[in-house]
């Protein structure tokens, strides 16, 4: 049995997961709500946050029951760090393929389009059932210092009077960090709340340092390991 699992905040990784599930003729399940049932091949799709794995992804991989694993990470054009090797280290499953794909950046409000052609060799290799060794990616030594806190300091989530207290942001937050449109200290700035709000009552405001960073040079490199 093959199953695609994903974590997605603003929708970029969800779009990739749904594409892969369609190509593999299986379903795509959210990591935060997926049952821990054994599968033969798991395809894990997730975003890179501050060169790190989101907490939801770490928790999921630690409990994953799969013989084989393929990893697909999305990043917004800045450094993806060492996320594939770090993800592989959290599970006993044998990794047979890995890819890091540039997509739109959630902090910039960019759409979920991606280059599907980049997945052709990734998909072709899933039938091999041959374990690979992932290389260590370059990672800023300071990226592990409170990444969620740095995101919260650099990016504010604002609530307008359009909020009608529907509670969607509260119930759909993967970190249980939203209370009536106001983020708590558990927020990782995945921006799922902003993307799902039916009233468009939530918006973001980046600080000066983050705006400078987001205006920097971006990469369109695809990292492929098969």
Model-derived regions: residue spans:
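FMN-binding flavodoxin-like domain, especially the glycine-rich phosphate-binding loop
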Residues: 2-3, 10-16, 22-152, 205-208, ...
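Iron-sulfur cluster-binding cysteine motifs and their immediate structural context
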Residues: 158-159, 164-188, 192-209
């Amino acid at each position: 049995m093959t199953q695609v699992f994903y974590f997605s905040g603003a929708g970029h990784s969800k779009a990739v997961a749904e594409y892969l599930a369609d190509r593999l003729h299986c379903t795509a399940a959210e990591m935060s709500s997926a049952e821990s049932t054994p599968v033969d091949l798991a395809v894990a799709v997730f975003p890179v946050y501050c060169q790190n794995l989101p907490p939801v992804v770490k928790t999921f991989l630690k409990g994953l029951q799969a013989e084989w694993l393929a990893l697909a990470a999305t990043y917004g054009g800045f450094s993806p760090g060492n996320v594939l090797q770090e993800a592989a280290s959290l599970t006993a499953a044998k990794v047979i393929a890995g890819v890091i794909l540039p997509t739109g950046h959630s902090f910039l409000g960019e759409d979920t389009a991606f280059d599907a052609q980049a997945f052709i060799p990734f998909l072709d290799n899933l039938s091999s059932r041959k374990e690979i060794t992932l290389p260590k990616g370059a990672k800023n030594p300071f990226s592990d210092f409170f990444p969620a806190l740095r995101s919260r300091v650099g990016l504010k989530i604002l609530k307008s009077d359009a909020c009608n207290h529907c509670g969607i942001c509260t119930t759909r937050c993967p970190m249980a960090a939203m209370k009536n449109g106001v983020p708590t200290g558990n927020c990782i700035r995945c921006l799922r709340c902003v993307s799902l709000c039916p009233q468009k009552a939530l918006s973001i405001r980046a600080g000066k340092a983050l705006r400078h960073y987001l205006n920097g040079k971006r990469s369109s490199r695809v990292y492929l390991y098969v």
